[in-house]
């Protein structure tokens, strides 16, 4: 086990995380499958619609690594896009679009790791209303 003094105090401290390197790896690992109508790259001043119920869910940014990571260190898709778009004069519009499921037992299961701050929540609005909101955000 070793001497307690030799143990690192906090392996997830901000001082130990190499965010620039992690972002570089993420950038290099993305694959563009098809660029229809030469959509990409987006203009720096583009208006972007982000649609999805997990856009602000830090634990879901970790994916299957959620048991080994700390969601407080995760940057959500919405926060990351908002920062990138705002600094370049663009605009990000968000719409939920849908619920993940209508089954309460599934919602409880999906929140078992973060029961104190659930990320999978139910929007009481009708599906048609959420879809209409998403379509409006994309226009």
Question: What are these language model-derived features?
Answer:
Residues 1-139:
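Preference for extracellular/luminal or secreted protein segments
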